[in-house]
């Protein structure tokens, strides 16, 4: 093994007030340094803040409380912080209703009255009588326990749902009689990265890992996923292991039953890209049959028709295609195209006996309807340029639902007639926002290596390109995730106050298929940062904004994007928001689900070249003394078990210790919260009020427009 730990932290700690190098004399909380060094391929790497990885330690908890106080004290001086919060609450306070779905004799839908912490699940019977079915706001006093997943059996008489406490990825599953709404079985514990899929009335399949050791729930590595079957009326300890564990070691496993209840399908993966697919014929009681093995391609089951299986895959088709095969011999050499690959990335849903292919052209949606032979039925006319999602349902459905949105259009739900192809508005939100006053345009700019990159720029009409417009530059750039236009009330308030919201579709995402994704992975990862930097330069060169009025923003992998960009080009922007970011690239794979991200990043143990490449951009390892960094708000949560808070703690500590100018470095730590999903409305509003007000304040804005 080429990597080894050189020494453990010694007992003698070096204490220093990290404000010493800050010319603004901001007195940051004291952060101790430890003498800890690791060796990678003969190279010694110091890790003075290793102790911050232990979120259970009393000294870490004390440090967190000091940083929370420091951040809140700084934010409290911003004169319009309360005004921004009021604006957000005002625009947020509108009724939000989801598309309906039918289960048994009821029609279900989610609704949030406006400012409820969590949306409520309602149901309506044939007479139109409506009642609350499940209210997540009653799961906890503070509204921080959320509904993570929900699944009904085929008849709609039984329901199992999972809950997340404090945003944790570790869930519990609760089982109800759908008619009486009473719990009928014990609560299942320690469930993670799991769906819920019923087999008749007997029970359901779910996934989990071994129970975490005491104290390691938030940071311990998760490996060897398992698919279980829980039979109603039995204890969880009696659940049948279907696949996984030591005999079939895979990091991620999901099992689900097809609509016809004939097949159990299992997807297996070791990383976030590439999977194996297995199928078991429950009717004929076969063993698992491999559809594809190895992890070179992505493949998923779209639908079945008797013995025929419909799959979508990027095998021999970087932009995806849909193929058909049979249960008797489903291996790749038997696959036949139903919907061939095109020049645009595609994903496929099924509903009402048809297939609906969503194509993405320059990050904008196009929808086509096909029959089961692959014959084009129609191209569906959308309300405009933007993002459409939905078009899924059971074979018997006559109507399907989809949503449409873009950066200046609140999400509207449409009802689609499968036979006529006509759409009608089902639910249009009554938001205090007039799209007619705003504009969203797509531009293309050139990155450092000559690659053309699309970017959406949204703002209020009448913008003057004088270089003085407050601008948020936001992106992600990883894991084949595409950033398509979507409305946000937070961005609406930003634009209402004179701001520009710009989103470049940089490499690493899925906007142009597998090749676009791969061009931003491993030793091509710097393409992502260069694309982001070029976006900022384009906005400044063309008068939209200037360095003094630009903020960089991103979350999770996007937090890495911001951290790497601000350390590579500290002169690019005035403000930076690395949110819940992956910031220690030498150790990210040591925690929770981090090892599964190696397809995108590589690891420091892979090779000397990979170690050197990661270290060359790892934000934690590239903060340099004597450098003026942007005014920074590092954003994290103390219960984040996806990207552990140690990433943000260590990066924030490095910045506070080495910042060489008056720009402040804040570490905003949300308590009793996770990676982002399931947060209460109050938590989301307050974080965004802090983010927007900090950005404007640091840009020197005195009064809101």
From Swiss-Prot:
Protein EC: 3.4.21.26
Entry annotated with the keyword Hydrolase: yes
Keyword vocabulary terms for this entry: Hydrolase, Periplasm, Protease, Serine protease, Signal
Enzyme superclass (EC): hydrolase
Gene3D superfamilies cross-referenced by the UniProt entry: alpha/beta hydrolase, Prolyl oligopeptidase, N-terminal domain
Entry-linked InterPro entries: AB_hydrolase_fold, Pept_S9_AS, Pept_S9A_N, Peptidase_S9_cat, Peptidase_S9A, Prolyl_oligopep/macrocyclase
KW Signal (keyword) present: yes
Record-annotated active site: 556 (charge relay system), 675 (charge relay system)
Gene Ontology terms: biological process: proteolysis
One GO term describing the cellular component: periplasmic space
Pfam families (UniProt xref): Peptidase_S9 (PF00326), Peptidase_S9_N (PF02897)
Location(s) in or outside the cell: Periplasm
Catalytic activity, as annotated: Hydrolysis of Pro-|-Xaa >> Ala-|-Xaa in oligopeptides
Signal sequence range: 1-20
Molecular function terms from GO: oligopeptidase activity; serine-type endopeptidase activity
Matches recorded under PANTHER family: PROLYL ENDOPEPTIDASE
Subunit annotation: Monomer.
Function: Cleaves peptide bonds on the C-terminal side of prolyl residues within peptides that are up to approximately 30 amino acids long. Has an absolute requirement for an X-Pro bond in the trans configuration immediately preceding the Pro-Y scissible bond.
Family: Belongs to the peptidase S9A family.
Annotated protein name in UniProt: Prolyl endopeptidase
Species of provenance: Elizabethkingia miricola (Chryseobacterium miricola)
């Amino acid at each position: 093994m080429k990597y080894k730990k050189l020494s453990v932290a010694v007992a003698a700690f070096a204490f220093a007030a990290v404000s010493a190098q800050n010319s603004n004399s901001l007195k940051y909380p004291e952060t101790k340094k430890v003498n800890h060094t690791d060796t990678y391929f003969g190279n010694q790497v110091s890790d003075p803040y290793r102790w911050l990885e232990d979120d259970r330690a009393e000294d870490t908890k004390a440090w967190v409380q000091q940083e929370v106080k420091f951040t809140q004290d700084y934010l409290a001086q911003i004169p319009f912080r309360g005004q921004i919060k009021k604006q957000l609450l005002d625009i947020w306070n509108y009724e939000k209703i989801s598309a309906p779905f039918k289960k048994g004799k009821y029609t279900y839908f989610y609704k949030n009255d406006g400012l409820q912490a969590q949306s409520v699940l309602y149901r309506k019977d044939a007479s139109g009588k409506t009642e609350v079915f499940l209210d997540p706001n009653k799961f906890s006093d503070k509204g921080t326990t959320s509904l993570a997943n929900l699944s009904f059996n085929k008849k709609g008489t039984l329901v199992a749902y999972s809950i997340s406490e404090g945003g944790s990825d570790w869930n519990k599953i609760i089982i109800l009689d759908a008619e009486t709404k009473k719990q009928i079985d014990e609560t299942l514990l320690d469930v993670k990265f799991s769906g819920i899929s019923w087999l008749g009335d007997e029970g359901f399949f779910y996934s989990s890992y071994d129970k975490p050791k005491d104290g390691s729930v938030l940071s311990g590595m998760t490996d060897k996923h398992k698919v279980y079957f829980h039979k109603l009326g039995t204890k969880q300890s009696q659940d049948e292991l279907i696949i996984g564990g030591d005999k079939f070691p895979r990091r991620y496993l999901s099992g689900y039953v097809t609509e016809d209840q004939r097949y159990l399908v299992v997807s297996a993966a070791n990383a976030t890209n590439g999977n194996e697919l297995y199928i078991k014929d429950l009717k004929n009681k076969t063993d698992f049959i491999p559809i594809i093995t190895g992890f070179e391609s992505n493949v998923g089951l779209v639908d079945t028709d008797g013995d025929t299986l419909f799959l979508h895959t990027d095998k021999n088709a970087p932009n995806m295609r849909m193929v058909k095969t049979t249960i008797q011999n489903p291996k790749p050499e038997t696959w036949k195209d139903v919907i061939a690959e095109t020049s645009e990335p595609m994903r496929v849903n099924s509903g009402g006996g048809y297939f609906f292919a969503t194509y993405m052209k320059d990050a904008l949606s196009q929808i086509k309807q096909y029959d089961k032979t692959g014959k084009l039925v129609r191209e569906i006319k959308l309300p405009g340029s933007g993002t459409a999602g939905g078009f899924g349902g059971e074979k018997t459905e006559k109507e399907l639902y989809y949503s449409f949105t873009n950066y200046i259009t609140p999400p509207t739900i449409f009802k689609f007639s499968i036979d006529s192809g006509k759409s009608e508005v089902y639910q249009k939100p009554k938001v205090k926002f007039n799209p007619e006053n705003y504009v969203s345009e797509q531009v293309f700019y050139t990155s450092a290596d000559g690659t053309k990159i699309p970017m959406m720029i949204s703002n209020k009409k009448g913008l003057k390109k004088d270089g003085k417009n407050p601008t948020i530059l936001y992106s992600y750039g990883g894991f084949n995730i595409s950033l398509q236009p979507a409305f946000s009330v937070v961005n609406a308030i930003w634009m209402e106050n004179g701001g520009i919201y710009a989103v470049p579709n940089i490499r690493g995402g899925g906007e142009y298929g597998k090749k676009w994704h791969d061009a931003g992975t491993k030793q091509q990862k710097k393409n992502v940062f260069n694309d982001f930097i070029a976006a900022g330069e384009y906005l400044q060169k063309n008068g939209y904004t200037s360095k003094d009025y630009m903020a960089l923003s991103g979350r999770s992998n996007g937090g890495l994007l911001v951290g790497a960009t601000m350390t590579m080009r500290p002169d690019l922007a005035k403000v930076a928001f690395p949110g819940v970011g992956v910031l220690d690239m030498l150790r990210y794979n040591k925690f929770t689900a981090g090892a599964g991200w190696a397809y995108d990043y590589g690891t420091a143990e892979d090779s000397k070249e990979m170690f050197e490449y990661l270290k060359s951009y790892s934000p934690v390892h590239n903060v340099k003394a004597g450098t003026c960094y942007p005014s920074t708000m590092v954003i994290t949560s103390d219960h984040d078990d996806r990207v552990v808070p140690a990433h943000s703690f260590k990066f924030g500590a490095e910045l506070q210790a080495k910042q060489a100018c008056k720009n402040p470095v804040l570490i905003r730590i949300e308590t009793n919260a996770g990676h982002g999903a399931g947060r209460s409305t109050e938590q989301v509003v307050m974080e965004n009020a802090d983010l927007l007000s900090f950005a404007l304040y640091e840009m020197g804005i005195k009064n809101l427009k």
